[in-house]
């Protein structure tokens, strides 16, 4: 899980311009990391590329926290 978390964190830091220390499993994209809906869509696209997977729209809509992303990737790779 650490490798997935590291890769997810790097993408979030690069895309949202937040500090790495702000990215925690419990961090909410919209409330804690100040991402808007377009940011989340772009994050999902980058995550799909990074992990060579497709995240269905209905699944992407359920992603609210960093933990949601990490769990989704771990469960669907």
Curated annotation (Swiss-Prot):
| Coiled-coil residue spans | none
Q: Which residues carry this modification: O-(pantetheine 4'-phosphoryl)serine?
A: 37
Q: Keyword Lipid metabolism: yes or no?
A: yes
Q: Which NCBIfam families match?
A: acyl_carrier (TIGR00517), PRK00982.1-2 (NF002148), PRK00982.1-3 (NF002149), PRK00982.1-4 (NF002150), PRK00982.1-5 (NF002151)
- Pathway per the UniProt entry: Lipid metabolism; fatty acid biosynthesis
Q: Which Pfam families match?
A: PP-binding
The transmembrane residues are none
Please give the GO cellular component terms listed in this UniProt entry: cytosol; membrane
PANTHER family attached to this UniProt entry: ACYL CARRIER PROTEIN, CARRIER DOMAIN-CONTAINING PROTEIN
Locate the Carrier domain: which residues? 2-77
For this entry, the protein name equals Acyl carrier protein
Gene3D superfamilies associated with the record: ACP-like
Organism name? Shouchella clausii (strain KSM-K16) (Alkalihalobacillus clausii)
Cite the PROSITE patterns for this sequence: CARRIER
Q: Which gene encodes it?
A: acpP
């Amino acid at each position: 899980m650490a490798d997935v978390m590291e890769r997810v964190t790097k993408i979030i830091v690069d895309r949202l311009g937040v500090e790495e220390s702000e990215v925690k499993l419990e961090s909410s994209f919209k409330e804690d990391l100040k991402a808007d809906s377009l940011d989340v869509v772009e994050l999902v696209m980058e995550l799909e590329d990074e992990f060579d997977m497709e995240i269905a729209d209905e699944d992407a809509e359920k992603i609210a926290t960093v933990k949601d992303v990490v769990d989704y990737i771990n469960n669907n790779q």
